[in-house]
Design a protein with these regions (language model features):
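Juxtamembrane helix-boundary/capping and inter-helix hinge elements in multi-pass membrane proteins
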Residues: 17, 46-49, 114-118
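Short helix-capping/hinge motifs at transmembrane helix termini and TM-loop junctions
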Residues: 47, 73-74, 139
Length: 214
């Protein structure tokens, strides 16, 4: 976290209005886990089970990596530096990188890459930027948090899209991802800290997907 990032958040805090706060509280919901779960369930039952698996996997893998980085970096949230943060119930754990931004950037850009429609790519870009701005406006993340979150989210969706095209047996992708992440999760499991709870839950989802695929 740099000094100018804190000053930027203070400047944004001065721009808050009742309307903007309600607006950005609505936008930030796009990055929440509940929406991702509802999306996957809808895809599974109404669209395509394989697509649902892929969206679920890339997002869960992305959020697991997000949790690992958070707990290595251990950057405190802006409210610990005097920022009057809003919607603190969405700001669990450490600050860097932004989980909401990364999660949304992952699954939304995955759709953009999958369907290759110009209008969809433009819409996804606007929404990713909106979610990132919402996290800054609400004072729960620094600019660097959301920028890195976007880069990681889009990067993981690109990698996932590539692997799904090249590797025909999806079970291998699920299993190897689970095995690669396991040492990090076991390491953090030795530390009794409630801040790791979200990472454990997300990792468990990947393990479940790997298990049911066999």
């Amino acid at each position: 976290m740099f000094a100018f990032e804190l000053e930027f958040l203070k400047w944004l805090e001065g721009l808050r209005t009742s309307f903007l706060t309600v607006f950005f509280e609505g936008i930030t919901i796009l990055g929440e886990e509940t929406l991702i779960i509802l999306l996957v369930v809808a895809l599974w039952f109404a669209v395509d089970k394989k697509l649902a698996q892929q969206v679920f996997f890339v997002t869960a893998a992305s959020l697991s990596l997000n949790g690992i980085i958070k707990n290595f970096a251990q950057v405190p949230r802006p409210f610990t530096k005097g920022i009057n943060s809003v919607r603190l119930d969405t700001a669990t754990g450490y600050s860097f990188p932004s989980g909401h931004t990364q999660g949304f950037a992952t699954w939304s850009s995955f759709f953009a890459l999958k369907f290759k429609k110009t209008w969809l790519s433009i819409l996804v870009s606007i929404l990713i930027a909106s979610v990132a701005i919402s996290r800054l406006y609400l004072g729960v993340h620094y600019p660097g948090d959301v920028i890195v979150g976007i880069l990681l989210g889009v990067g993981i969706s690109i990698l996932g899209n590539y692997l799904f095209k090249k590797v025909k047996d999806l079970k291998k992708i699920y299993l190897w991802t689970f095995l690669i992440l396991t040492p990090f999760i076991v390491c953090f499991a030795c530390i009794a800290d409630p801040l790791f709870a979200d990472m454990f839950k997300t990792f468990g989802m990947i393990g479940g997907l790997a298990a049911v695929s066999f």
